[in-house]
Protein backbone atom coordinates (compact mmCIF):
# COMPACT_ATOMS: atom_id res chain seq x y z
CA UNK A 1 0.00 0.00 0.00
CA UNK A 2 2.84 2.40 0.83
CA UNK A 3 4.00 2.16 -2.79
CA UNK A 4 0.64 3.52 -3.90
CA UNK A 5 0.36 6.20 -1.24
CA UNK A 6 -0.72 6.04 2.37
CA UNK A 7 -3.89 8.09 2.18
CA UNK A 8 -6.63 9.27 -0.12
CA UNK A 9 -5.52 12.51 -1.74
CA UNK A 10 -8.57 14.71 -2.06
CA UNK A 11 -8.88 17.61 -4.50
CA UNK A 12 -7.35 20.84 -3.28
CA UNK A 13 -10.09 23.48 -3.18
CA UNK A 14 -8.27 25.69 -0.69
CA UNK A 15 -7.89 28.74 -2.88
CA UNK A 16 -9.87 31.87 -3.63
CA UNK A 17 -12.60 30.96 -6.15
CA UNK A 18 -12.65 30.49 -9.02
CA UNK A 19 -10.08 27.78 -8.22
CA UNK A 20 -8.04 27.01 -11.37
CA UNK A 21 -7.10 23.41 -12.19
CA UNK A 22 -5.15 22.21 -15.21
CA UNK A 23 -5.27 18.84 -16.97
CA UNK A 24 -2.21 17.78 -18.97
CA UNK A 25 -1.21 14.62 -20.82
CA UNK A 26 -0.47 12.97 -24.13
CA UNK A 27 -2.99 12.79 -26.97
CA UNK A 28 -5.34 9.84 -26.67
CA UNK A 29 -5.10 9.61 -22.89
CA UNK A 30 -8.74 10.72 -22.51
CA UNK A 31 -8.01 14.23 -21.25
CA UNK A 32 -11.10 15.96 -22.66
CA UNK A 33 -13.62 13.37 -21.46
CA UNK A 34 -11.81 13.27 -18.11
CA UNK A 35 -12.19 17.05 -17.83
CA UNK A 36 -15.97 16.62 -18.09
CA UNK A 37 -15.95 13.70 -15.62
CA UNK A 38 -13.96 15.74 -13.11
CA UNK A 39 -16.34 18.68 -13.56
CA UNK A 40 -19.32 16.42 -12.87
CA UNK A 41 -17.56 14.92 -9.83
CA UNK A 42 -16.90 18.41 -8.39
CA UNK A 43 -20.50 19.46 -9.02
CA UNK A 44 -22.06 16.31 -7.57
CA UNK A 45 -19.68 15.52 -4.71
CA UNK A 46 -18.27 18.92 -3.76
CA UNK A 47 -21.31 21.03 -4.73
CA UNK A 48 -19.15 23.36 -6.83
CA UNK A 49 -20.14 25.33 -9.92
CA UNK A 50 -17.57 24.45 -12.58
CA UNK A 51 -16.51 26.10 -15.83
CA UNK A 52 -14.62 24.03 -18.41
CA UNK A 53 -12.14 25.65 -20.80
CA UNK A 54 -10.46 24.08 -23.83
CA UNK A 55 -6.95 25.32 -24.58
CA UNK A 56 -6.45 22.79 -27.38
CA UNK A 57 -6.33 24.91 -30.53
CA UNK A 58 -4.42 22.24 -32.47
CA UNK A 59 -6.49 19.06 -32.57
CA UNK A 60 -9.42 19.43 -34.99
CA UNK A 61 -12.72 19.81 -33.11
CA UNK A 62 -11.07 19.51 -29.67
CA UNK A 63 -12.77 22.69 -28.45
CA UNK A 64 -16.08 21.56 -29.95
CA UNK A 65 -15.76 18.21 -28.16
CA UNK A 66 -15.53 19.90 -24.76
CA UNK A 67 -18.37 22.27 -25.63
CA UNK A 68 -20.53 19.29 -26.63
CA UNK A 69 -19.72 17.42 -23.40
CA UNK A 70 -20.70 20.55 -21.48
CA UNK A 71 -24.02 20.83 -23.29
CA UNK A 72 -24.84 17.12 -22.85
CA UNK A 73 -24.11 17.19 -19.12
CA UNK A 74 -25.23 20.70 -18.19
CA UNK A 75 -21.71 21.94 -17.37
CA UNK A 76 -20.69 25.52 -18.07
CA UNK A 77 -18.05 25.94 -20.82
CA UNK A 78 -16.20 29.03 -22.01
CA UNK A 79 -17.54 30.12 -25.43
CA UNK A 80 -15.10 29.42 -28.27
CA UNK A 81 -13.45 32.30 -30.12
CA UNK A 82 -11.85 30.99 -33.31
CA UNK A 83 -8.13 31.63 -33.63
CA UNK A 84 -7.59 32.80 -30.07
CA UNK A 85 -4.27 31.65 -28.56
CA UNK A 86 -4.08 29.63 -25.30
CA UNK A 87 -2.63 32.50 -23.23
CA UNK A 88 -5.49 34.80 -24.30
CA UNK A 89 -8.08 32.07 -23.69
CA UNK A 90 -6.72 31.72 -20.13
CA UNK A 91 -7.15 35.44 -19.40
CA UNK A 92 -10.66 35.45 -20.85
CA UNK A 93 -11.59 32.34 -18.85
CA UNK A 94 -10.48 33.84 -15.54
CA UNK A 95 -12.70 36.90 -16.15
CA UNK A 96 -15.65 34.85 -17.42
CA UNK A 97 -15.52 32.48 -14.45
CA UNK A 98 -15.78 35.43 -12.08
CA UNK A 99 -18.72 36.87 -14.01
CA UNK A 100 -20.51 33.50 -14.08
CA UNK A 101 -19.97 32.75 -10.40
CA UNK A 102 -17.89 29.63 -11.07
CA UNK A 103 -16.18 28.06 -8.05
CA UNK A 104 -13.71 26.04 -10.13
CA UNK A 105 -12.23 26.39 -13.64
CA UNK A 106 -10.91 23.28 -15.38
CA UNK A 107 -8.39 23.95 -18.15
CA UNK A 108 -8.11 21.16 -20.73
CA UNK A 109 -4.66 21.64 -22.32
CA UNK A 110 -3.46 20.41 -25.71
CA UNK A 111 -1.84 16.99 -25.89
CA UNK A 112 0.75 15.68 -28.32
CA UNK A 113 1.50 12.19 -29.58
CA UNK A 114 4.77 12.49 -27.66
CA UNK A 115 6.39 15.01 -25.37
CA UNK A 116 8.09 17.90 -27.16
CA UNK A 117 9.63 21.20 -26.11
CA UNK A 118 6.90 23.34 -27.66
CA UNK A 119 4.21 21.48 -25.72
CA UNK A 120 6.12 21.78 -22.46
CA UNK A 121 6.86 25.49 -22.86
CA UNK A 122 3.19 26.17 -23.64
CA UNK A 123 2.06 24.26 -20.54
CA UNK A 124 4.61 26.13 -18.44
CA UNK A 125 3.29 29.45 -19.82
CA UNK A 126 -0.30 28.42 -18.99
CA UNK A 127 0.76 27.42 -15.48
CA UNK A 128 2.33 30.86 -14.95
CA UNK A 129 -0.86 32.63 -16.08
CA UNK A 130 -3.51 30.61 -14.23
CA UNK A 131 -1.46 29.50 -11.18
CA UNK A 132 -3.41 26.24 -10.77
CA UNK A 133 -4.30 24.84 -7.35
CA UNK A 134 -4.15 21.39 -8.96
CA UNK A 135 -2.35 20.13 -12.05
CA UNK A 136 -3.52 16.66 -13.02
CA UNK A 137 -1.71 14.37 -15.42
CA UNK A 138 -4.25 12.28 -17.30
CA UNK A 139 -2.61 8.97 -18.22
CA UNK A 140 -3.85 5.79 -19.88
CA UNK A 141 -3.32 2.90 -17.46
CA UNK A 142 -2.85 0.50 -20.37
CA UNK A 143 0.39 2.22 -21.42
CA UNK A 144 2.12 1.18 -18.18
CA UNK A 145 5.81 2.05 -18.11
CA UNK A 146 5.48 4.66 -20.87
CA UNK A 147 2.88 6.49 -18.81
CA UNK A 148 5.18 6.40 -15.80
CA UNK A 149 8.09 8.02 -17.65
CA UNK A 150 5.70 10.60 -19.14
CA UNK A 151 4.61 11.45 -15.59
CA UNK A 152 8.20 12.05 -14.60
CA UNK A 153 8.79 14.38 -17.58
CA UNK A 154 5.69 16.43 -16.81
CA UNK A 155 6.68 16.61 -13.16
CA UNK A 156 10.07 18.03 -14.16
CA UNK A 157 8.33 20.85 -16.07
CA UNK A 158 5.25 21.80 -14.07
CA UNK A 159 4.08 21.45 -10.49
CA UNK A 160 2.24 18.17 -11.01
CA UNK A 161 -0.06 17.54 -8.05
CA UNK A 162 -1.92 14.39 -9.03
CA UNK A 163 -2.52 11.68 -11.60
CA UNK A 164 -5.84 10.58 -13.08
CA UNK A 165 -5.53 7.05 -14.49
CA UNK A 166 -7.94 6.41 -17.36
CA UNK A 167 -9.12 3.03 -18.66
CA UNK A 168 -8.50 1.74 -15.15
CA UNK A 169 -11.28 -0.83 -15.27
CA UNK A 170 -9.13 -3.73 -16.49
CA UNK A 171 -6.75 -6.16 -14.81
CA UNK A 172 -3.66 -4.08 -15.64
CA UNK A 173 -4.64 -1.09 -13.54
CA UNK A 174 -2.86 -2.24 -10.40
CA UNK A 175 0.52 -2.60 -12.06
CA UNK A 176 0.16 0.71 -13.88
CA UNK A 177 -0.79 2.46 -10.64
CA UNK A 178 2.24 1.07 -8.81
CA UNK A 179 4.72 2.03 -11.54
CA UNK A 180 3.20 5.51 -12.04
CA UNK A 181 3.36 6.31 -8.34
CA UNK A 182 6.80 4.78 -7.82
CA UNK A 183 8.53 6.44 -10.80
CA UNK A 184 6.83 9.85 -10.69
CA UNK A 185 6.37 10.18 -6.91
CA UNK A 186 3.09 11.96 -7.70
CA UNK A 187 -0.10 10.77 -5.94
CA UNK A 188 -2.83 9.08 -7.96
CA UNK A 189 -6.05 10.94 -7.20
CA UNK A 190 -8.71 9.45 -9.49
CA UNK A 191 -9.44 6.41 -11.65
CA UNK A 192 -11.45 6.59 -14.86
CA UNK A 193 -13.41 3.34 -14.82
CA UNK A 194 -15.70 3.58 -17.85
CA UNK A 195 -17.20 5.76 -20.56
CA UNK A 196 -20.07 7.37 -18.64
CA UNK A 197 -19.83 10.88 -17.18
CA UNK A 198 -19.98 9.57 -13.60
CA UNK A 199 -17.33 6.87 -14.20
CA UNK A 200 -14.64 8.63 -12.20
CA UNK A 201 -13.81 7.34 -8.75
CA UNK A 202 -11.54 8.64 -6.01
CA UNK A 203 -8.37 6.56 -5.79
CA UNK A 204 -8.12 4.48 -2.61
CA UNK A 205 -4.60 3.00 -2.23
CA UNK A 206 -5.74 0.26 0.16
CA UNK A 207 -8.44 -0.96 -2.21
CA UNK A 208 -6.11 -1.13 -5.20
CA UNK A 209 -3.57 -2.99 -3.04
CA UNK A 210 -6.28 -5.54 -2.27
CA UNK A 211 -7.03 -5.93 -5.97
CA UNK A 212 -3.36 -6.47 -6.79
CA UNK A 213 -3.10 -9.08 -4.03
CA UNK A 214 -6.16 -10.86 -5.40
CA UNK A 215 -8.32 -10.17 -2.37
CA UNK A 216 -11.05 -8.49 -4.35
CA UNK A 217 -12.53 -5.11 -3.63
CA UNK A 218 -15.74 -5.62 -1.70
CA UNK A 219 -16.07 -2.01 -0.57
CA UNK A 220 -15.94 -0.66 -4.13
CA UNK A 221 -18.44 -3.29 -5.30
CA UNK A 222 -20.89 -2.35 -2.57
CA UNK A 223 -20.48 1.36 -3.28
CA UNK A 224 -21.02 0.78 -7.01
CA UNK A 225 -24.12 -1.30 -6.33
CA UNK A 226 -25.41 1.38 -3.96
CA UNK A 227 -24.93 4.02 -6.64
CA UNK A 228 -26.67 1.94 -9.30
CA UNK A 229 -29.61 0.74 -7.20
CA UNK A 230 -29.97 3.52 -4.68
CA UNK A 231 -28.95 3.22 -1.04
CA UNK A 232 -32.37 2.01 0.17
CA UNK A 233 -32.53 -1.01 -2.12
CA UNK A 234 -29.13 -2.21 -0.90
CA UNK A 235 -30.28 -2.16 2.71
What do these predicted ranges mean?
Residues 53-55, 78-81, 107-110, 138-140, ...:
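Structural motif
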Residues 4-5, 23-24, 41, 69, ...:
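Aromatic-enriched hydrophobic runs in primary sequence
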Residues 1-55, 62-86, 90-99, 104-107:
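Primarily NTPase-proximal linker/entry elements flanking Walker-type ATP/GTP-binding cores
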Residues 90-91, 102, 114, 120-127, ...:
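Conserved phosphate-handling catalytic cores of large alpha/beta enzymes
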Residues 29, 57-60, 84-86, 111-115, ...:
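Short, small-residue-enriched loops and turns at beta-alpha junctions
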Amino acid sequence: VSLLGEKNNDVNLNAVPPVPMMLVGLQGSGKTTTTAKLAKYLENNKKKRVMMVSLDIYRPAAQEQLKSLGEQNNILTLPIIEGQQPADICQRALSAANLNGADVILFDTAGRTQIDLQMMSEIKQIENIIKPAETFLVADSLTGQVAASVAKEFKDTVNLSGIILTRADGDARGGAAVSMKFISQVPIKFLGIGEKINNLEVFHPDRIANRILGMGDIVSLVEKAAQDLGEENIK
